[in-house]
UniProtKB/Swiss-Prot annotation:
One of its GO terms (cellular component) is cytoplasm. Its EC number is 2.8.1.13. The gene is mnmA. Keywords: ATP-binding, Cytoplasm, Disulfide bond, Nucleotide-binding, RNA-binding, Transferase, tRNA processing, tRNA-binding. It catalyses: S-sulfanyl-L-cysteinyl-[protein] + uridine(34) in tRNA + AH2 + ATP = 2-thiouridine(34) in tRNA + L-cysteinyl-[protein] + A + AMP + diphosphate + H(+). It comes from Levilactobacillus brevis (strain ATCC 367 / BCRC 12310 / CIP 105137 / JCM 1170 / LMG 11437 / NCIMB 947 / NCTC 947). The record marks 128, 346 as: Interaction with tRNA. ATP binds at residues 12-19, 38, 127. InterPro entries: MnmA-like (IPR004506), MnmA-like_C (IPR046885), MnmA-like_central (IPR046884), MnmA-like_central_sf (IPR023382), Rossmann-like_a/b/a_fold (IPR014729). Catalyzes the 2-thiolation of uridine at the wobble position (U34) of tRNA, leading to the formation of s(2)U34. This is tRNA-specific 2-thiouridylase MnmA. Belongs to the MnmA/TRMU family. Disulfide bonds join 103-200.
Length: 375
């Protein structure tokens, strides 16, 4: 059996069952394990509803049960500067950001990795559902988890091979029921703890409008069809996302009684465009443009290549052709079949089979040459 006792692994422990089992498995495999709880948001803030105190108590219970030292580290400033300000800036632009992608890139696999290295870590480990393979040169390749329903490579798609070379994902080969069973058999306090949902700083109940207007002024405006018919009024463009159905305040009408969906925004005129029907043609795009391109591995794929992509978490893969612009900073993604509700600000994540190649941030979606969101 391999002697891992000289290899130090610092585990990011959230107080949940996944990271608890990560720490347990590594300890059982003989690694020198240290647990670290990250505090990224001030939950004493009048709007914060995170449960950091209770989560830290659970980390302490699990660490004591496993028999590992544990610490707490505060990344509130880094989170505010690198993640939260980005989140607000994107909403100001009328886009719908994904803070989890940026949090992984900037906090969990940058600030935390730097902190772990100061503790003498050889690797960090997290409870993400993903897998890594190493090529002949020893470099890491990001692969989907065995549990396809829980796979989190979408959120890890902005990581670099340099970061991943220092990372372990010890539960990527398990499905969620197995993780809970392992925790239960080991008597871990988190075995039955429910999964955390939603964005840390908003909390699980997701009073999103109330939270957002604390930081950004809302400006009400008209809600109308592409033909100029006013159907109602919106509370502020930042509260709506492309393809949204709920919360519009306008039900189906007429013979067909089809529901209404958000199909576009005009930031300059402060207009929210709506259209009837799930299959409204204004919701379907033939291609998109994206920037902030990031490849996990710096392999030359040429300027054009075919692969699959996801435009949101847990979506089925879509066949696409990727066209890299000459400057290498922007990309055009052409869909094999029209795709619905492509949302600026979200990540488009590229795959080759089970390998996550990287991602870019969506700027605009088009139907032929017409930009959809601007109608």
């Amino acid at each position: 059996m391999q002697d891992n006792s000289q290899t130090r692994v610092v585990v990011g422990m959230s107080g949940g069952v996944d990271s608890s089992v990560v720490a347990l498995r590594l300890k059982q495999q003989g690694y020198d394990v240290i647990g670290v709880f990250m505090k990224n948001w001030d939950d004493t803030d009048e709007n914060g509803v995170c449960t950091a105190t209770e989560d830290y108590k659970d980390v302490a219970k699990v660490a004591a049960k496993i028999g590992i030292p544990y610490y707490s580290v505060n990344f509130e400033k880094e989170y505010w500067d690198r993640v939260f300000t980005y989140f607000l800036d994107e909403y100001k632009k009328g886009r719908t950001p994904n803070p989890d992608v940026i949090c992984n890139k900037e906090i969990k696999f940058k600030a935390f990795l730097d902190y772990a290295l100061e503790l003498g870590a050889d690797y960090i480990a997290t409870g993400h559902y993903a897998q890594l393979t190493r090529d002949e040169a020893g470099h890491a390749h990001l692969m989907r988890a065995v549990d396809q329903n829980k796979d989190q490579t979408y959120f890890l798609s902005q990581l670099s091979t340099e970061q991943l070379d220092r990372v372990m994902f010890p539960i990527g080969d398990l499905v969620k029921p197995q993780v809970r069973e392992i925790a239960k058999e080991a008597g871990l306090a988190t075995a039955e703890k429910k999964d955390s949902m939603g964005i840390c700083f908003i909390g699980e109940k997701g009073h999103f409008k109330d939270f957002l207007k604390t930081y950004l002024p809302a400006k009400a405006g008209d809600m109308m069809t592409v033909d100029g018919e006013i159907k109602g009024h919106h509370a502020g463009l930042m509260y709506y996302t492309i393809g949204q159905r709920k919360g519009l305040g306008i039900g189906g009408d007429g013979i067909d009684n089809e529901p209404w969906f958000v199909i576009g925004k005009d930031l300059q005129k402060n207009i929210l465009y709506v259209g009837k029907g799930y299959h409204n043609p204004h919701l379907y795009a033939t291609h998109l443009s994206a920037s902030d391109i990031h490849w996990v591995n710096t392999i030359d794929r040429g300027s054009d290549f075919h692969c699959t992509a996801k435009f949101r978490y847990r979506q089925k893969d879509t066949g696409v052709t990727v066209h890299l612009n000459d400057d290498g900073q922007q990309v055009t993604v052409e869909f094999d079949d029209p795709a619905r509700a492509i949302t600026p600000g979200q990540a488009v994540v590229f795959y080759n089979g089970d390998e996550c190649l990287g991602s870019a941030i969506i700027d605009a979606a088009y139907n032929q040459e017409r930009e959809l969101q601007l109608i």
